[in-house]
Design a protein with these regions (language model features):
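SAM-dependent methyltransferase catalytic region
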Residues: 1-187
Length: 187
């Protein structure tokens, strides 16, 4: 996409550096599904882990993230059946239900409710009731996407045991992307 935009905007923005900066700051946006995928996308797009770094080919960004967003998202657990007593961060005893499923993706709580040290695999793109509002919140304005390209995961473990049980989630990414009404959607 960026190569086609670079060639297509040559007459409108003759200076290559200005054209690339315009494309990367105004026309290309991304949402990482994990911290690692966001960093990989930034390296691919900006030639730098940081969009505003000295090696970035985009020179107008003020933030390290640029237009590739990632923020840890948590699952919303529902339907837990077992209650355990545990403590919160301040040491106060609390009751916690286990063996639930995520409201948005169906992932098993037993497999993925494992604290802040490990990846949650709760993807913001599908963990929302209003994807349009989320996109506006992330990128600061109402956005209209002509093209959406994605490579979402196909499934998540649902805690069913020994890797043979999984919740399909690919279709949830497709459904959310369709709500953004792009002219072209490819996953």
């Amino acid at each position: 996409i960026t190569a086609r935009l670079t060639k297509g905007l040559e007459a409108a923005i003759p200076d290559l550096e200005q054209r690339v900066d315009h494309i990367l700051t105004k026309q290309v946006f991304g949402i990482g599904i994990t911290d690692l995928t966001a960093k990989l996308a930034r390296r691919s797009l900006y030639c730098s882990k940081w969009a505003n770094g000295p090696h970035s080919i985009a020179k107008s960004f003020e933030t390290e993230a640029g237009n590739v967003w990632f923020e840890r998202t948590e699952h919303i657990w529902v339907g837990g059946t077992e209650r355990v007593l545990t403590a919160d961060a301040d040491g106060h005893q609390i009751k916690k239900f286990t063996n639930g499923k995520c409201l948005y993706c169906g992932a098993g709580q037993k497999a993925l409710d494992r604290g802040d040290a490990l990846e949650s695999h709760a993807y913001a793109f599908i963990h929302t009731d209003d994807i349009t509002a989320l996109i506006a919140d992330l990128f600061g304005e109402d956005m209209q996407f002509d093209v959406i390209i994605g490579n979402p995961p196909y499934q998540l473990s649902d805690g069913g045991g020994s890797g043979t049980s999984a919740s399909p989630i690919y279709q949830k990414f497709v459904e959310q992307a369709k709500k953004l009404e792009p002219r072209l959607l490819t996953m």
